[in-house]
Every structure is written in structure tokens, then in C-alpha cells.
Amino acid sequence: MANKVDVKELLDAGVHFGHLTRRWNPNMAPYIYMERNGIHIINLYKSAAKMQEAGDALAKIAASGRKILFVATKKQAKEIVAEQAEKANMPYITERWPGGMLTNFVTIRKAVKKMASIDRMKKDGTFNSLSKKERLQVDRLRAKLEKNLGSISDMSRLPAALFVVDTTREHIAIKEAHKLNIPIFAMVDTNSDPREVDYLIPSNDDASKSISKVVSYVADSIVEGLSERKSEKSTKKKEEKASKEEKSDKAPKEKKEKKAEVPSKDAEDKKAMKEAKNDVKLESKSETLDKAKASNEEE
């Protein structure tokens, strides 16, 4: 379960500041507390409840071993999102959203593989065999791919969810996620439509302090889910080991069969055995003669 949200901390971070009243989206009305100086003020108690709800859901996704893709291309959110996504070991997009990132994921994966292929060329020496012009072109291509796709190089399949900062700006990512039924978690300001996302966090998506507060909470929830998964795996391994040991202890031990004595191959032992056999034969012969002699005397 995600950590409890402190409303005072949200207030200090300026999470409650919305947009100008003339730029509002009527669908955000349930999350607006009041209007002050022509600006809408977000209800922080509702923001805290929604943050908790989103945090719990994201922790469960992380605990299942699936990836959550962070999306934020606006200037004031880039560095914050990149830092927090890396902390949670999750992929992220902070540069221009590549068209078809989700709906044409196969092509995106090919571009990522191309990047890995260039790295292999540099390792095995193939790169050095190219002309100076070709090396320059390959380096430029590698730098471009790294800038746009380097942060998703570990994402081998479609993400289980998206976390978005500013749904109005990232509308293409939202549309692609809708087509593939990928759940969307997002910071939603008073000028955006909350119906576009599955888990909204009513919040100021323009101020860096507000973005940092919300995104760090989300990242911490994901880290918590990952640590839960790790501990579950560890417990499972211990249980399996204990079960195997218990079975081996209960299994009946096989009785060792006594092996028949093998005749000695030693020369002296053989000689002794032969003499013993002869003594037995002589003894039995003398007994037979004595018995015959005795019977004759009786007659």
C-alpha cells in the first residue's frame, strides 16, 4: 500500500493552483475548491485521495513485474520525470513523442535494436573498418536514437500503464494508449479533460515544485511495489527449499542389502581352505571304516 499523502505538503508545493477561470474544462468542476483572483483552486483533499488511489494501483502493477511508461515532454517536467523514472527503474519519454510509439511498437523496437547493433559494431571492430564519412553518419544516427529512444531501450514489450504529466500536451500518447486499452495515470490540471484518463491526480502540472511532489510520490509507490515483489520471490524460494528438505527427510531410507561374501583370492587363504577340506574328507573316511569294523565284530 502506498504511503499516506500529507495535504500540507501538497499545499506547500503549490499543487492547488489551477489555470485561469476562462481556460477551465467544466469536467474538472468536481475537483475545484474555489476561485481566487481569476484562478481556480484545486481541492487538495480530493487530490490527496486520488494520489493514494493511483499510488496503490501503480504499486500493484510494479509488483506484478510489468513496466510503467512515464511521459512528460514539457520543459519544467523533463529532468524531474527522468530522474524519478530512473529511480523506479522504469522507461520514460521526455523528448518528442515518437509517432506510433505504442501502436507501431514493432518498428520502434527495430530502431532500438539498430542502436544495439551499432554498439556491437564498435565492440567487435567492424566500426573501424568503415570510411570516415560512414563512421560520422553512424555516430549521428546513434546519437539521435539515443536521444529519442535511449530511455526505453529496456522496454521489450508494451507497457502495462502510462503515467503522464499534462494530458493536453501529450494528447497523441493518450490516443495511442486508448487504442490499445492501456490504463492511463496522469496529473490533470483544471484546463484538461479528466475523462481521458483512468486514474487522475487533480494537480498543478505547470510548476516544477508541484510536478516534483506528485511524480516523486508516484515513483516511491512503484519502488514499494518492486520491493514487495522481491520479498515475495525470496519467501517463495525459501518455502520451496524447505519443502524439498522436508520431502527428502520423509522419504524411506533404502535398506542396504548384505553382499555375499566373496571367496578370498589370497594364495595362503586358498591353501588353508584346501587343507581344511582334506581334513574333513579324511575324518569322514576314518569314521566310515570304524563303523564298518564295529558292525563286523557284532556279527
UniProtKB/Swiss-Prot annotation:
Keywords in alphabetical order: Ribonucleoprotein, Ribosomal protein
Record keyword Cell wall biogenesis/degradation present: no
Domain of life: Bacteria
UniProt-listed PROSITE patterns: RIBOSOMAL_S2_1, RIBOSOMAL_S2_2
A biological-process GO annotation: translation
UniProt GO cellular component terms: cytosolic small ribosomal subunit
Signal peptide span: none
Disulfide bonds: none
A single GO molecular function term of this UniProt record: structural constituent of ribosome
KW Ribosomal protein (keyword) present: yes
Region called Disordered, residue ranges: 227-299
Similarity comment text for this entry: Belongs to the universal ribosomal protein uS2 family.
HAMAP family in the record: Ribosomal_uS2_B (MF_00291_B)
Protein's UniProt name: Small ribosomal subunit protein uS2
Source species: Christiangramia forsetii (strain DSM 17595 / CGMCC 1.15422 / KT0803)
